[in-house]
Regions:
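Preference for bulky hydrophobic residues occupying beta-strand positions
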Residues: 139, 168-170
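Intrinsic disorder/low-complexity segments enriched in polar/charged and small flexible residues
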Residues: 21-24, 130, 166, 239, ...
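Short coil-to-beta strand junction motifs in C2/discoidin
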Residues: 160-166
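Residues that act as N-cap/strand-start positions at coil-to-secondary-structure junctions
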Residues: 131-133, 162, 180-184
Length: 448
């Protein structure tokens, strides 16, 4: 299943590289990071003694984490060598049965005999397959040396003594090299201690990176635009998870995000938006105007760049990005003009582009009143398309009203809502910025 996940993205990326599928994969694997950051996580592979054990394997750790470590290995040894190793594995075991180690041994055989750098593939992969969790790579300069060290990353910031064999791409200035971190620390001589240093260059590693303050400042300054999309995505994702783990303050994170006012990539904005949505749930009432001003300042340059209306010939991902930043501006930035334009889109059909219509739907719901709620409910009951019906249903969970969220929770358990849709509707109610706890209590009280 992990290999199938890897091939799903590899094949599509080879067919349509402009879709940036490996960047999308970087976003998708975040779910595996989240689960693997808990002490209750599990190893990717474990003995299966019952059907229940087998069922337990069908999760993000098998699919996303498993696919991610295959991608990490492929990028470290090189796609051609990886492909040759898989080919050797298939030919060697044609019409036979195999175990996991057979794949690692086949790849290791190729990289040990083709004249290239020798990599201990089985030992490397065993440290990821048979150990739960993943490492945080700390990066600092000590004198004339770059120091990389590892410890387990957990949300409660209480790592155990687990060590991994970590394949790392390090870019120092304009030169990228590969290092294998096999112990708790490795030191790399530097010819220029003032160079910009990027660890997890190109972003294939299944680990988080923690830079010292001076090294982070070098990256988030004028050189930020020189990072590729996945590198910038990982930079934000790692910083946000440092906040979740209590290793970075929310104030420091907001200051960090100010360097992204010129960001124009969907994937990076998706992690920024997710973090801002989470922050909005804990912002004190008296600080909400300041938070809204910050969001508006952060988003406005992108709104000005992309505009409100689609442009003929623009990239497919631009429409999704426009919808995302419109929601940020209108909901979290509390921009009244953006809210008005969203109402025009939804009620007057001033724009029919699907991503903007979807964004306008969420904005009107999040900023709407009881009259708007009745309109959404009516459209759900009499939709023009099945897609519109689902959009209207989920919008019922966005309203900023305890009474309306209570109605939505009750509505989820009626015969008007399909049983396969009810859990997703309740999940969205729980995710409501102001009334999530109310929805959670409803679920607890009605759990059977």
């Amino acid at each position: 299943e992990a290999f199938a996940t890897f091939m799903e993205y590899a094949a599509c990326d080879a067919f349509m590289p402009q879709w940036q599928l490996w960047t999308t994969f970087g976003l998708d694997r975040s779910a595996a990071f989240d689960v693997d950051s808990l002490h209750s996580t599990r190893t990717i592979e474990f003995p299966v003694n019952s059907p229940a054990d087998a069922d337990g394997m069908f999760d993000v750790l098998t699919y996303q984490k498993g696919g991610a470590i295959l991608r990490m290995l492929e990028q470290y040894i090189g796609p051609d060598r990886f492909r040759a190793g898989v080919s050797h594995y298939l030919k060697t075991h044609a019409y036979g049965n195999t175990e996991t180690n057979d794949l690692w041994d086949a790849i290791e055989h190729v990289v040990s005999t083709d004249g290239g750098p020798i990599v201990p593939v089985r030992r490397l992969m065993d440290s990821w397959i048979w150990q739960a969790g993943y490492p945080l790579i700390s990066v600092r300069i000590d004198g004339s040396e770059l120091v990389l060290s590892q410890r387990q990353f957990t949300f409660d910031n209480s790592p155990d003594a687990t060590l991994w064999v970590v394949p790392i791409h390090v870019r120092i200035g304009d030169t990228t090299s590969k290092v294998l971190l096999e112990t708790d620390e490795i030191r790399i001589p530097l010819s220029d201690t003032s160079a910009t240093i990027v660890v997890n260059a190109n972003g294939p590693g299944f680990y988080r990176v923690e830079y010292s303050a001076d090294l982070l400042l070098r990256i988030t300054g004028s050189t930020l635009s020189s990072l590729d999309t996945l590198e910038r995505y990982n930079l934000v994702d790692d910083a946000w998870n440092a906040v979740v783990a209590g290793a970075m303050s929310s104030d420091a994170y907001i200051a960090f995000l100010q360097g992204f006012t010129n960001e124009r990539d969907l994937a990076v904005w998706q992690i920024i938006a997710a973090s801002l949505k989470s922050l909005s749930r804990i912002v004190p009432t008296e600080s909400e105007p300041d938070f809204a001003t910050f969001v508006k300042t952060l988003v406005s340059p992108s709104i000005a760049h992309f505009g409100w209306k689609p442009i003929a010939g623009e990239e497919d991902l631009t429409a999704k990005l426009r919808g995302l930043i419109v929601q940020l501006l209108a909901i979290h930035g509390k921009d009244t003009d953006a809210q008005r334009q969203c109402r025009d889109i939804l009620f007057n059909n001033t724009v029919t582009e699907p991503e903007l219509v979807a964004a306008a739907t969420n904005v009107v719901a999040a900023t709407g009143d009881a009259t708007d709620y009745e309109w959404f409910l009516g459209r759900y009951r009499d939709p023009s398309t099945p897609q519109e019906q689902i959009r209207m249903l989920y919008a019922l969970a966005e309203f900023d009203s305890a009474e309306l969220i209570a109605r939505t929770c009750d509505f989820a358990l009626t015969s008007e809502v399909k049983t396969q849709n009810a859990p997703f509707l309740l999940n969205r109610c729980i995710a409501n910025r102001k009334h999530g706890e109310q929805a959670w209590n409803f679920v607890r009280q009605n759990w059977q």
